[in-house]
Amino acid sequence: MNMKNKSEKEMTHFGFQNVYKDKKTSLVSNVFHTVASQYDLMNDLMSFGIHRMWKRFTIYRSEVYVGCIVLDLAGGTGDLSIQFSRLVGNTGIVVLADINDSMLHIGQKKLRDLGILNNVIYIQADAEALPFSENTFDCVAVSFGLRNFTNKEQALFSIHRVLKPRGKLLILDFGVPNFKVLHKIYDLYSFHILPKIGKCITQDINSYRYLVESIRMHPDQETLKNMIIRTGFSNVEYFNMTFGIAVLHCAYKC
């Protein structure tokens, strides 16, 4: 292998920038260290609160019940973990895992302030090398996290390994809008308004510019579906929400 091809294989995207793979993790980490304290507020402002509806639908499709063991991966500030903890009850377990300790700290504090103390475990973990045994979880959910992973396929293989047979995968993230007429409006809002909102609230325009760019670099609905199939999952389907701005992919481990 020549040096050029080797270099290309070691590269990935950080927003619209090409960076070395081993650098992306630290760059993404810096973004979320910066935005962690205002993350929930910014989600409400940027989506006009609609992200809560998307997450409710994710929970609805989860098939999680009392006694289940659930992994909320890249779970950040814990929105899904709150709902999962109620579904699994006292005999189940929710593992809230995130590679970023700032986000994990915010999530832990939020859940404890809500009185959720007994059935949620907090673990700092890399999605691409999950520190769990095979066939551990009934359900793994990734909410607005997959696009930030350095190697998405490696993360999906890792998730597949820790899911129980017939366990369910849920991936909630941004997609490509269904209607072309929405693209210009969506781009105008995303590239010109969202970063300014971020700057006003957090005094940090660059982190929110990255978040917008990461959405554009994320695989479209069909591409992600095929990636999930390639990594060993079956019965893969997806649900467009808000005209395809958000998408929930669902799949099962065979």
UniProtKB/Swiss-Prot annotation:
Its EC number is 2.1.1.163, 2.1.1.201. This is Ubiquinone/menaquinone biosynthesis C-methyltransferase UbiE. The keyword rRNA-binding does not apply. Belongs to the class I-like SAM-binding methyltransferase superfamily. MenG/UbiE family. One of its GO terms (biological process) is aerobic respiration. GO terms for molecular function: 2-methoxy-6-polyprenyl-1,4-benzoquinol methyltransferase activity; demethylmenaquinone methyltransferase activity. InterPro entries: SAM-dependent_MTases_sf (IPR029063), UbiE/COQ5_MeTrFase (IPR004033), UbiE/COQ5_MeTrFase_CS (IPR023576). Pfam families: Ubie_methyltran. It is an enzyme of class 2 (transferase). Methyltransferase required for the conversion of demethylmenaquinol (DMKH2) to menaquinol (MKH2) and the conversion of 2-polyprenyl-6-methoxy-1,4-benzoquinol (DDMQH2) to 2-polyprenyl-3-methyl-6-methoxy-1,4-benzoquinol (DMQH2).
